Amino acid sequence: MQLDYKSIDFNTKWILSGSSSIIYRETLNSTLSIALDKQRQINDKGKVVITDHQTSGKGTHGKQWISTAYKDLTFSIILGNENSFGQKLIDECCLAMVHVLSLYDLKANIKYPNDIYINNKKIVGILLSNIQSQGENKPYQALSIGMNVNSEIDIKSIDEKAKVNSTSIFLELGKEIKREELLKLIIQNIDPAIQKQGYL
């Protein structure tokens, strides 16, 4: 089912709120293709780029993030270039994701530097991306998150190159959850981390 993004109001401080805070595309090769666009970085800082069907998601070290269309969450937050975010932001976001999962009675742990696991199976990946623009002192940045939410398959079953097993909230709980509610929780818990690191 398509994400009902128009019903979501994040009610956040750094990340934008309201109906215009989400840049939604039903299908994208990667949310980073929009989030790292210079004009988007200048005009849409604080907005969330999200898609229901990401065909070529980006992971660390050039790896691909695989998600199930209309089942999972794949999004990027446009950070602009006013701050120089680094690993500390990822660390804070990992802690936030562990907390969000605990609200669903799921015990998760952090696998440094940027992944979240449940029972030794990956459920969340976090990526901080930079793009340097000519004549700019600081790079433009975007924070991307992929979470296995309602998918019903282990990534290793469809990608023979995958080195780890994966899981999802559905596989752990045995039931689907509303992605809109989960997205709002994630954004509300990540927002303080961006505020904190942005002022360091």
Q: What is each model feature region?
A:
Residues 1-106, 176-177:
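N-terminal lobe of the biotin/lipoate ligase/transferase fold
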Residues 2, 82-108, 118-200:
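Long, positively charged amphipathic alpha-helical accessory segments at protein N-termini or as interdomain linkers
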Residues 22-24, 112, 148:
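Active-site proximal loop and beta-alpha junction motif in alpha/beta enzyme cores
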Residues 44, 60, 111, 121-123:
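Short beta-strand-initiation
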Residues 51-52, 112, 145:
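A secondary-structure boundary/capping signal
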